[in-house]
Amino acid sequence: MKFNFVVGAAVLVLAGSAAAQEGGKTISKTTISLGTATPGGGFPLYGNAFAEVLNEADATILIEPRNTKGSNENIPLLEAGGLDIALVAGEPSYEAFMGIGRSPIRLKILTAMYSSPGMFVVRADSPYKTIRDLVGKPVAFGAKGSGLPILSRYTLDGIGLKQDEDFQSIYLDRAGDGPAMVLDGRAAALWGAGIGWPGFKSVAEGPGGARFIAPTAEEIAKIKAKHSFLKPLTVPAGSYPGQNEAINALGSWSFVLTRENLPDDTAYRLARTLHGVEAALCKKLPQACETTAANTVAAAPNVELIHPGVLKYFREIGVVK
């Protein structure tokens, strides 16, 4: 996979020091650039909450969220040193760590963000009830640089469907453009993932409500057999307006990744601050309730992929031996 990107001077505010006054004392701040994704999606929502809660909790760090094109831009930006930390969806992370279509990355995991069960949303008054009902129809699969189209590609491949041949695939410039396309009929469905995902919420809050389409139990078994890294996940009842029953789906965990050379002490401070305010982050953003030390250890493909500074903190609190 070849990545083309431009790193502008404005992006290159890396983990460096700045000074601030508090109570008459000069406090040295470490500025940390955080790559998110295009406006209107789940990553900017999470990234802004993450930065706000951590900045409030620790006066010595200043996390600055930046909109990017998403996971597929965040990875090369981290590799080039254009970002300190960035949000990356599970499937691009998996491919990059495993060296699928490229050489393996040397980036590290700061934390698991949240699980991302993938599914489609359609208008409640539409005739579509199953994934195969959507074959041949215009479907918005997410923003061009995001991880969502990768998750959908694996999901559909598991049941013998090709994303760009069996559907009229639509790839968005901005994640926030998808819901309007479903509501006005330009798209039959919108693919997305997660609990509290903005796109699903927007369609569900539309005039006629929404219906969600996920793989059937038989389809889930087929997908798991072909792509075992995808895990069974559940969207609890009531996660979206009008969703009265739990939805079983498949997906993976999104991560906050760090550049390879992020200093150990910076990663340690970030981990200590983050996991000290898990409750505050959860209160700020429901999907961030899954951002815990225990989930990070469980979700990491290999514990050695977790940043050494984070591992030091995890050993101190007993989640890693």
For the regions a protein language model found, what residue spans apply to each?
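An extracytoplasmic/periplasmic, membrane-proximal ligand-sensing/linker region
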Residues: D177, D184, G194-F212, K222-F229, ...
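Short beta-strand-centered segments that line the small-molecule binding cleft or hinge
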Residues: I105-Y114
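N-terminal (or domain-start) structured segment
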Residues: Q21-A89
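Short, solvent-exposed loop/turn segments at the edges of secondary structure
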Residues: M113-P117, L250-G251
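Short, low-complexity disordered leader/linker segments with a strong preference
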Residues: M1-T30
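Pocket-lining segment of extracytoplasmic ligand-binding domains
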Residues: G90-P92, I100-G101, S126-P127, Q163-L262
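Ligand-binding clefts/hinges and TM-proximal coupling segments of bilobed small-molecule sensing domains
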Residues: F141-T155, L230-A299
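Bilobed "Venus flytrap"/periplasmic-binding protein-like clamshell domains
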Residues: T31-A57, I61, S116-D184, A279, ...
